[in-house]
Structures are given as structure tokens and as C-alpha cells.
UniProtKB/Swiss-Prot annotation:
GO cellular component terms, A-Z: cytoplasm; ribonucleoprotein complex; ribosome
Name of the protein: Large ribosomal subunit protein bL33A
GO MF annotation: an example: structural constituent of ribosome
Family: Belongs to the bacterial ribosomal protein bL33 family.
Gene name of this polypeptide: rpmG1
InterPro entries the record matches: Ribosomal_bL33, Ribosomal_bL33_sf, Ribosomal_zn-bd
Bilayer-spanning residue ranges: none
Keyword tags: Ribonucleoprotein, Ribosomal protein
Gene Ontology biological process: translation
SUPFAM superfamilies: Zn-binding ribosomal proteins
Length: 48
């Protein structure tokens, strides 16, 4: 089973991306993606 999660930028805290995540994984998703507000690649973490 997969669920929809939202990713937010660690620098500016904007919620820029949504993606699917497997429910069996316990740790939070952490991906380096482009933030259009910061205008650079930053770490994006899964939000609640």
C-alpha cells in the first residue's frame, strides 16, 4: 500500500512537491530537489 506525502523545503519551509511513499517504511522521506522560492537545490523533507 502506498500513501501520498508532501515534501517541504528545509530552507524556506514551502511545500513544493507531493509524492507517493510506501507505508511499510518508518523513516521520513528526505530528497534533494529544486525549490523555486529559494531558486536552488535544497533538501526537502516529508511533512505530517
Amino acid at each position: 500500500m502506498r500513501k501520498k506525502v508532501v515534501l517541504s523545503c528545509e530552507e524556506c519551509k514551502n511545500r513544493n512537491y507531493s509524492t507517493m511513499k510506501d507505508t511499510s517504511s518508518v523513516e521520513r522521506l528526505e530528497i534533494k530537489k529544486f525549490c523555486k522560492t529559494c531558486n536552488q537545490h535544497t533538501v526537502h523533507k516529508e511533512t505530517k
